[in-house]
């Protein structure tokens, strides 16, 4: 009887889940926009504050965007994971392309559906043709 009561009150392993959805880039002056370092900073820091967390699960759905913002967000994820000693598991939903895949690479493991669009990190460059 006592052991079953004790099991009931024991804490289960905690996995913190956060979502990173949208185009990666700076927020416009009208307040709309996607993911950037400034608007993901508090979310990520709060996720890593849970001392009992066994892992952080990041659900990603992004076609990519700004290389600079992708790098800053991914670096923050890696830094927090190392500092807090909490592994990050990334789950790619519909799309994790370009910068979205860059974010997923910040995790220890990447999971996706067989139908998810993954990868395709590239750069579009325009020139005057000479």
What are these regions (language model features)?
Residues 1-130:
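Terminal-region recognition feature
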